[in-house]
Amino acid sequence: MLDANLKTQLKAYLEKVSQPFEIVASLDDSDKSRELLGLLQDIVGLTDKITLKTDGSDARKPSFSLNRPGADIGLRFAGIPMGHEFTSLVLALLQVGGHPSKLDADVIEQVKGIEGTFEFETYFSLSCQNCPDVVQALNLMAVLNPNIRHVAIDGALFQDEVEARQIMSVPSIYLNGEVFGQGRMGVEEILAKIDTGAAARDAEKLTARDAFDVLVVGGGPAGAAAAIYAARKGIRTGVAAERFGGQVLDTMAIENFISVQETEGPKLARALEEHVRHYEVDIMNLQRASKLVPAKNAGELHEVRFESGGSLKAKTLILATGARWREMGVPGEQEYKAKGVCFCPHCDGPLFKGKRVAVIGGGNSGVEAAIDLAGIVAHVTLLEFDSKLRADAVLQRKLYSLPNVEVITSALTSEVKGDGQKVTGLVYKDRNSEEFKSIELEGIFVQIGLLPNTEWLKGSVELSPRGEIIVDARGETSLPGIFAAGDVTTVPYKQIVIAVGEGAKASLSAFDHLIRTSAPE
């Protein structure tokens, strides 16, 4: 199951296991059970600290639990955790085996203090880059607190459950049999939902912080670069972000970040955060900005208010809140989001195996999505508003070579149809004939560009007609002492490498502003 190179790497990791435990597998006579058995035998063959039993009686087969004598740990994988979930498996082995987590001590204590009964189930796909964060967070919580149980379920292997629960997006998380959430979540986000008093406590702590010399709002590539450049100047630096990594977390293959030949979004996001944490930067996650209150007079502090109820003050600000997927804005879209309307073909594509889907958008992202999906689904219809596709020629050639793809141009998507539970089709207007036409399908993947996260800034800094923050050559906004960088600004070409450079530039400009405004007259 594991090649020699992977065995060597895993053996080195398993040397960190300090407490013996057992793997209990529940198997049947299927090929997948035999495949899982091979994986588990490979694992126990690398260390004498782990033993394997194959007499498990769990209803989900193939599956396995990790059990440590003397500890009540409710952690199970249903399926074969390879692909993106192999890291989740390795971390689970280490944590059940007594290796400490890198999670902040305060968060660990908060997890340990949770009371009640929490039976979590997470449905994932092996190609989903967002799923491991959820799986790893809940696995760790299950290791730390016996009141928390978690099963990570490969939706592709348990299609009957996926169909019964009408799951059309991963990760999908259930708590005690009810829908808990969808999409990427970390430990702190999960805690915020189950520990109802945490939000108020965190807001108080946030507001109590001293003012920063530079406060970066946003934790994507631009925000990370800005924080590093500021911290290296020896000034008090903070980063307040809804999620560190930003939109990079939702990006699959990255092959144009100079000096890194190939990587994946979550991996790059982790590297960015590790680099920032190397310096004295106060990182405040799960903070979504709600209002900017600029300083009224020179020498006063700017204030940023957050949806959590907390606020922060700073001498200078760098706004790097990035952008999000643009939605179609048509009837039915919100109702059927995550019920057939999706934005991540890598994550959710496997759930539509053998089904019919549409991709909305004929740029590079739309055409790449259609190409990826064509290898999984029965049929792909790509709809483009313009009279021609806008993707690179090499991508278009690949697209048109696929037998199960239809391209419709001059098409305005006008409605998402459904049966109250899931998507059943869409309606589009032929812009040439003005005729409305219907397509029967099960999934819609929206790939029509980005929308800047600037709603909270209206009435403060100057915005372009597209809602982007207008900046000058130094990254400064229309308000002195407030700078901006990355996809949220008017700087053209929304690329990671450009965002990093713009973040560094904005930070240098902010430092220059601090020097000039604090210099004695």
Swiss-Prot record:
Serves to protect the cell against DNA damage by alkyl hydroperoxides. It can use either NADH or NADPH as electron donor for direct reduction of redox dyes or of alkyl hydroperoxides when combined with the AhpC protein. Homodimer. This is Alkyl hydroperoxide reductase subunit F. Gene3D superfamilies: 3.40.30.80, FAD/NAD(P)-binding domain. It holds the Pfam family Thioredoxin_3. PROSITE patterns: GLUTAREDOXIN_2, PYRIDINE_REDOX_2. GO terms for cellular component: cytosol. Keywords: Disulfide bond, FAD, Flavoprotein, NAD, NADP, Oxidoreductase, Redox-active center. It comes from the Bacteria. Its EC number is 1.8.1.-. Its cofactor is FAD. GO terms for biological process: cell redox homeostasis; response to reactive oxygen species. The gene is ahpF. InterPro entries: AhpF_NTD_C (IPR044141), AhpF_NTD_N (IPR044142), Alkyl_hydroperoxide_Rdtase_suF (IPR012081), FAD/NAD-bd_sf (IPR036188), FAD/NAD-binding_dom (IPR023753), Ferredoxin-NADP_redctase_2 (IPR050097), Pyr_nucl-diS_OxRdtase_2_AS (IPR008255), Thioredoxin-like_fold (IPR012336). NAD(+) binds at residues 356-370. FAD binds at residues 213-228, 477-487. The keyword Amino-acid biosynthesis does not apply. Binds 1 FAD per subunit. GO terms for molecular function: flavin adenine dinucleotide binding; NAD binding; NADH-dependent peroxiredoxin activity; thioredoxin-disulfide reductase (NADPH) activity. The active site is a redox-active disulfide bond. Disulfide bonds join C344-C347. Belongs to the class-II pyridine nucleotide-disulfide oxidoreductase family.
